[in-house]
Amino acid sequence: MARKTNTRKKRVKKNIEAGIAHIRSTFNNTIVTLTDTHGNALSWSSAGALGFRGSRKSTPFAAQMAAEAASKVAMEHGLKTLEVTVKGPGAGREAAIRALQAAGLEVTAIRDVTPVPHNGCRPPKRRRV
């Protein structure tokens, strides 16, 4: 039986001017996804995908690097302006937004879409270190 060679599809260059940056910032990691206005992903990056491990994943610097990496790929697709949606309580929220602006993308709006429970699940107990 012939063995299939693992061929990767070449990324098709899209020409998209405006998009949305979804920043998911948790206590452990920061994930940045850049999409078009319909929500179709153009590029994504995270602190863990860039090689940060353990407690270094949750730092603002790691979030900044993730935002830079995602914006570099998205700008190749022609992305220029962004709306930013931020979700989660993590340390990398502001750092990721600043990195997107520094990369040359124009931020038109910042929206906080962190889910707030109407007294749903019991939160984790306090840490005693």
UniProtKB/Swiss-Prot annotation:
Keywords noted in UniProt: Ribonucleoprotein, Ribosomal protein, RNA-binding, rRNA-binding
Domain of life: Bacteria
Transcription regulation keyword on record: no
GO biological process, one term: translation
One GO location term (cellular component): ribosome
Annotated InterPro entries: Ribosomal_uS11, Ribosomal_uS11_bac-type, Ribosomal_uS11_CS, Ribosomal_uS11_sf
A single GO molecular function term of this UniProt record: rRNA binding
Keyword RNA-binding in annotation: yes
NCBIfam families membership: PRK05309.1, uS11_bact
Family: Belongs to the universal ribosomal protein uS11 family.
Assembly notes: Part of the 30S ribosomal subunit. Interacts with proteins S7 and S18. Binds to IF-3.
Protein's name in the database: Small ribosomal subunit protein uS11
Species: Bacillus mycoides (strain KBAB4) (Bacillus weihenstephanensis)
